[in-house]
């Protein structure tokens, strides 16, 4: 929920969704772009891990399939289904008010409660789509020896949906306004008997994740050294865009007024349209754009957005 001073005050961002990624003074928004930036700037060839392990099918690059799977299925229809399992009492809390502002219309707890059975049915439909692949032959969702982006995206959404359906996490989600004593409504749909393939995959993935070392570090709010590090980089060049198969299409983007130096607004194409990020267009690529925010924060950064899932518009008379 808002406020998120790290976004607004520190970086000058009106964009309200998390997570974001900062690599030096370059800030990346949306998980889809964050993943590609991490893979590019911290490649396996330098000893880093990857969520695109080698394919077991010689010569087949599945990366585009995994990216589309995560962006167009897991993050959209499957996500909408799992949010429909949130306990109705949550929508009567300040979190519900916040989400109504994000979505752009009011949320009626009683109407949403009446839709839970419908949403459970949709949840089961998604499990049914996954079951044949995981039951018949595949260890993972893509033909790989280790989990890929496809597995990570589905696992997170499925785990979150199962937890939120029984109220786990809603106390924190609602700022302490709703307790965590809900009924486990998802187990009637997702269980070993109905979907043994998905069930086995789910537990296999959890075992794999548990076997990995915990490399996470935490920075307290009192530690501001990282801000000083960014300030020292303000005079340096931006990292630029993550490489794509084809370079920028300047002729096509020019027809839309998307040329370097103009003022643009950037908003998600689903929710959060009321919080546009306005800034000077720095780079324009096929999959990504970067801007220098008009609103100045504590540190001056270059902000990157993916083009899929976002609407970029030039501001009239904005040529600089």
Where are these regions (language model features)?
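Catalytic lobes of large eukaryotic enzymes
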Residues: 196, 238, 252-260
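Catalytic cores of secreted or luminal carbohydrate-active enzymes
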Residues: 185-248
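GST-like fold's C-terminal all-alpha helical module
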Residues: 73-201
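Non-transmembrane alpha-helical segments in soluble domains
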Residues: 35-39, 127, 131, 202-206
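GST-like domain detector, emphasizing the conserved glutathione-binding G-site
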Residues: 1-117, 141, 251-252, 258, ...
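Generic structural signal for secondary-structure transition and capping sites
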Residues: 43, 135, 139, 210-211
């Amino acid at each position: 929920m808002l406020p998120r001073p790290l976004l607004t005050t520190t970086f000058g961002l009106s964009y309200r969704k998390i997570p974001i990624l900062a690599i030096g003074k370059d800030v990346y928004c949306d998980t889809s772009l964050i993943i590609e930036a991490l893979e590019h700037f911290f490649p396996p060839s330098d000893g880093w891990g990857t969520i695109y392990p080698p394919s077991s099918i010689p010569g087949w690059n599945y990366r585009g399939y995994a990216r589309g799977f995560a962006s167009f299925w897991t993050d959209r229809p499957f996500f909408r289904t799992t949010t429909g399992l949130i306990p109705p009492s949550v929508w009567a809390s300040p979190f519900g008010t916040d989400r109504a502002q994000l979505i752009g219309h009011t949320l009626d707890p009683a109407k949403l409660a009446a839709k839970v059975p419908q949403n459970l049915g949709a949840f089961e439909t998604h499990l049914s789509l996954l079951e044949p692949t995981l039951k018949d032959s595949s260890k993972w969702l893509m033909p790989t020896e280790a989990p890929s982006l496809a597995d990570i995206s589905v696992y997170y959404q499925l785990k979150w949906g199962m937890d939120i359906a029984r109220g786990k996490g809603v106390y924190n989600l609602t700022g302490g306004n709703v307790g965590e004593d809900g009924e486990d409504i998802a187990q009637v749909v997702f269980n070993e008997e109905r979907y043994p393939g998905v069930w086995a995959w789910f537990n296999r993935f959890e075992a794999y994740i548990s076997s990995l070392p915990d490399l996470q570090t935490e920075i307290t709010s009192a530690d501001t050294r990282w801000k000083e590090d960014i300030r020292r980089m303000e005079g340096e060049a931006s990292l630029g865009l993550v490489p794509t198969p084809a370079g920028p299409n300047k002729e096509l983007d020019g027809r839309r007024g998307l040329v370097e130096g103009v003022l643009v607004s950037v908003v998600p194409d689903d929710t959060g349209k009321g919080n546009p990020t306005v800034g000077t267009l720095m780079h324009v690529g096929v999959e990504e754009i970067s801007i220098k925010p008009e609103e100045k924060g504590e540190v001056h950064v270059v902000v990157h957005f993916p083009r899929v899932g976002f609407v970029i518009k030039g501001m009239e008379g904005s040529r600089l």
